[in-house]
């Protein structure tokens, strides 16, 4: 009560105006007190925010020219001093108190929101589902390969993992680790970002690769399972899902350089998007190789699709390394971690690894290992593009 009283005295009692890009037609009239990110979203101005407004992804940057107050400690770890001097802020951390003037990229106004329908939601690996969503009839998601969408996660309670539809071939690990026993709860609506696996020619639908997020078994009583992935794993054909997009910056560079793609786990999504666009649409003549790390044969997906591309295009090679192949896999290919296999089998003998463009998406340990390996070869950071996730 004391805090509410103090806030009521500190904030203006009337409406405030947010001027966007100096265009009075885009003005937003709102009550003070909310974050800039949430107010903009409420007016269909969808800044990207992979963390759902938690201040950790630093993707909701915009310029607050007037009325934003001083930059906060929660922002300075993400915004450089030079950018801060140019009035860059994190919209999720800026509380609306006074009239404001802000600048956002023009492409933000092309972002839309839809109610999509689940077409299918099948496992492609033990802990990864391929979620396919259809947009409303006549709608099209005009995006670049490597883009992502944000999906709204509603409030839900007592969502039981035992209700998930998991194909029988993946049951052994779910049984062994008793994953069926988990229950998820979400106390308030949030949103999360997922890279699209579909490419622009498939623009009337959205395909995601989503890995279920669970804590290690010893922490099940202390740490909850992932809010978004639990919700997504429970979706059934015909269900309605709210998404917004397109967003993104993990795009194909318009050069003639050689390209090396490195992926692991659900990091497959933007790899598929890029590679299908490069070869099915652009029919590129660039030299391209794809290096994917999986645990075992059961965790390999879209395998036949990439083999087909390899057969049709002599300028493409597809390489897989298994870190823990099973006896029944009868695996005769590469083993070990993908960064080491890429180094030993290709880059170590390449005439100039520093002239290659690298595109990476996968779990942080894989990204970190690849970074170290490429740094040891003298590859400049500007030659590396990331779609990193936690």
Task: Give the label of every model feature segment.
Residues 2-5, 9, 77-134, 139, ...:
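Fe-S ferredoxin-like electron-transfer domains
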Residues 2-53, 64-83, 284-390:
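Reductase modules of NAD(P)H-dependent flavoproteins
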Residues 48-58, 91-93:
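Cysteine-centered iron-sulfur cluster-binding motifs in ferredoxin-type domains/subunits
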Residues 59, 101, 148, 237-240:
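Residue-level marker of beta-strand positions
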Residues 107-116, 185-192, 300, 332:
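Short coil-to-beta-strand transition motifs
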Residues 117-237, 295, 321-325:
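Ferredoxin-reductase
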Residues 231, 244-257:
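A short, basic/flexible loop-to-alpha-helix module at the beginning of a structural domain
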């Amino acid at each position: 009560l004391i805090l509410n009283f103090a806030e009521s005295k500190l904030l203006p009692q009337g409406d405030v105006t947010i001027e966007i890009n100096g265009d009075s037609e885009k003005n937003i009239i709102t009550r003070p007190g909310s974050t800039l990110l949430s107010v903009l979203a409420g007016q269909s101005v969808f800044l990207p925010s992979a963390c759902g407004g938690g201040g950790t992804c630093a993707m909701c940057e915009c310029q607050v020219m007037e009325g934003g107050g001083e930059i906060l400690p929660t922002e300075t770890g993400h915004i450089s001093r030079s950018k801060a001097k140019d009035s860059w802020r994190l919209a999720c951390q800026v509380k609306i108190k006074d009239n404001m003037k802000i600048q956002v990229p023009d492409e933000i106004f092309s972002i839309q929101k839809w109610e999509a329908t689940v077409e299918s939601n099948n496992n492609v690996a033990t802990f990864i589902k391929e979620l396919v969503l259809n947009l409303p009839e006549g709608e099209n998601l005009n995006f670049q390969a490597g883009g992502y969408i944000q999906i709204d996660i509603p409030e839900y309670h007592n969502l039981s993992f035992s209700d998930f539809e998991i194909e029988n071939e993946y049951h052994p690990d779910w049984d062994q680790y008793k994953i069926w026993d988990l229950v998820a709860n979400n106390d308030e609506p949030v949103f999360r970002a997922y890279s699209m696996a579909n490419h622009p020619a498939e623009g009337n639908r959205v395909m995601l690769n989503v890995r279920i997020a669970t804590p290690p078994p010893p922490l099940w009583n202390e740490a909850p399972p992932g809010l978004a992935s639990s919700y997504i794993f429970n979706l059934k054909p015909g269900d309605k899902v709210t998404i917004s997009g397109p967003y993104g910056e993990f795009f194909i560079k318009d050069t003639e350089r050689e390209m090396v793609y490195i992926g692991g786990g659900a990091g497959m999504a933007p790899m598929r998007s890029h590679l299908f666009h490069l070869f099915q649409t652009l029919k590129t003549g660039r030299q391209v190789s794809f290096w994917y790390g999986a645990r075992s044969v059961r965790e390999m997906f879209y395998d036949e699709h990439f083999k087909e591309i390899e057969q049709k295009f002599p300028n493409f090679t597809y390489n897989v390394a298994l870190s823990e192949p099973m006896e029944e896999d009868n695996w005769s290919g590469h083993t070990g971690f993908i960064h080491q296999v890429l180094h030993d089998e290709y880059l170590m003998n390449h005439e100039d690894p520093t002239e290659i463009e690298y595109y990476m998406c996968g779990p942080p340990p894989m990204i970190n290992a690849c970074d170290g390996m490429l740094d040891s070869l003298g590859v400049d950071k500007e030659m590396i593009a990331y779609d990193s996730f936690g």
